[in-house]
Amino acid sequence: MGQKVNPTGIRLGITKPFASTWFASNKDFASNLDGDHKVREFLKEKLKRASLSKVVIERPAKSIRVTIHTARPGVVIGKKGEDVEKLRLAVSKIAGVPAQINIAEVRKPEMDAQLVADSIASQLERRVMFRRAMKRAVQNAMRLGAKGIKVQVSGRLGGADIARAEWYREGRVPLHTLRADIDYAIARGNTTYGVIGIKVWIFKGEIIGNMPLQAEVPAAKPKRKTNRKPK
C-alpha cells in the first residue's frame, strides 16, 4: 500500500524554504533547536485567536529574529504595539538572547493550508457538519485561484462509533512533481466524541525559476542504410 511522504519535507531546499534559517556549531545546535521549538509552541498557544500561519526564526549575531505570519496582524500587535512588546520580552526570555519581532500579513487566508485546516478544526468543534466545512474550504480556495486542493478529515466523524477517514478534492494536486508548489498543513479538532484530524493540501502552481532548466538538444537524424555495392 502506497504511503505519502510529507510534501513540505521532501521539497525543502528545492522549492520550499526552511522555517529556521541559522547556522550553529555542534555544541550550540541542540540548544538553538530546542529554543526554536519552545518559541513556536509558546506563540502557537499565545496567538490562538490571531490566525497564525507560520513562524520563521533567524538568529543573527547572538540574537533572535522572529517573523510571525498571520491573517490578523492587528490582534498580534495590540493597542499601540503593547501586545507585540510583551511577546518580544517573552520570546527573549525563552530564547535567552535579545529578540526582535516582525509581523507579516497573510493576504489570502483561504489559500493558506494551515489557516484552512485551523478553520475546519474550529468549525468541527462548534458542531458544524464536517462535509459542509470541507466543501466550503475547497470552494473558497478554488475561487481565489488555487490550482487544486484536497482536504481530509479522520476520526469519529459525526459521532460515529467507528472512526473513518473522508476526503474531498477539486482540481489537481500533483504530490510527485517536486517543482509543484504544494502547501500542506495538519490540525486537530477536539470534539466531544474525540479528536478529529484534519489534513489540507493546496496546489498553487509550479515553480520554475529556482530550478536550472536544461537546454533541449534536437535528436540526431538516423542514417539511411543502403544496400548498394561500391562500383
Swiss-Prot record:
The keyword rRNA-binding is assigned to this record: yes
GO cellular component terms, semicolon-separated: cytosolic small ribosomal subunit
Signal peptide: none
UniProt-listed SUPFAM superfamilies: Prokaryotic type KH domain (KH-domain type II), Ribosomal protein S3 C-terminal domain
SMART domains assigned to the protein according to its UniProt record, in alphabetical order: KH (SM00322)
Keyword Ribosomal protein annotated: yes
A molecular function (GO) term: mRNA binding
Ranges of residues in domain KH type-2: 39-107
InterPro entries recorded: KH_dom, KH_dom-like_a/b, KH_dom_type_2, KH_sf_prok-type, Ribosomal_S3_C_sf, Ribosomal_uS3_bac-typ, Ribosomal_uS3_C, Ribosomal_uS3_CS
Function: Binds the lower part of the 30S subunit head. Binds mRNA in the 70S ribosome, positioning it for translation.
Entry protein name: Small ribosomal subunit protein uS3
Top-level taxonomy: Bacteria, Pseudomonadati, Pseudomonadota, Gammaproteobacteria, Alteromonadales
